[in-house]
Amino acid sequence: MSSDRHTPTKDPPDHPSSSSNHHKQPLPPQPQQPLSRYESQKRRDWNTFVQYLKSQNPPLMMSQFDYTHVLSFLRYLDQFGKTKVHHQACVFFGQPDPPGPCTCPLKQAWGSLDALIGRLRAAYEEHGGGSPDTNPFANGSIRVHLREVRESQAKARGIPYRKKKRRKTKNEVVVVKKDVANSSTPNQSFT
């Protein structure tokens, strides 16, 4: 037997040695993967919404809010917006590039609100909010509000909203061709 081999010794329970496993030191926290930009923004948005609920008089619990509180949150956010939205009475109403300043308010852009609702909808479900059917962020009134905001901002700014067409990728075309090729019988010929 070699002398450099260490044989474990039994220590009495009241005198543990430094090599024993009686007192496990906590492992240092494992470095977490940094959150993606989307996940970081979703967490920030959720925390902002929760803080908004707590600031209400009386403060609201997560189980107490509904779509009306979501709508009031969206209106509250307008004060921090950076998009000029002209009133109908403004001389620059409907002009995309007004030649001068006006006193019309800055509001949240429709696209920002739409993305925010998407992130909050996902965050609500992640925080145990229940089924997508009961998600206040997915309520039809929220969709109607967003549509109205989009249309009014498009008119006020003179920039019509056009839905971007989705391009088909090569893979989609190949799949379609494969489906057509696979649907024919082996004995059939195309002439």
Swiss-Prot record:
Basic and acidic residues: compositionally biased ranges: 1-14
Pfam families reported in the protein's UniProt record: ALOG_dom
GO molecular function ontology, one term from the record: DNA binding
Record's keyword terms, sorted: Developmental protein, DNA-binding, Nucleus, Transcription, Transcription regulation
Residue span, ALOG domain: 37-165
Polar residues bias locations: 181-191
Gene Ontology BP terms: mRNA transcription; post-embryonic plant morphogenesis
InterPro entries assigned to the protein according to its UniProt record, in alphabetical order: ALOG, ALOG_dom
Cell compartments where the protein resides: Nucleus
Keyword Endoplasmic reticulum belongs to the record: no
Residue stretches spanning the membrane: none
Similarity field: Belongs to the plant homeotic and developmental regulators ALOG protein family.
The protein, known as: Protein LIGHT-DEPENDENT SHORT HYPOCOTYLS 9
Upper lineage: Eukaryota, Viridiplantae, Streptophyta, Embryophyta, Tracheophyta
Gene: LSH9
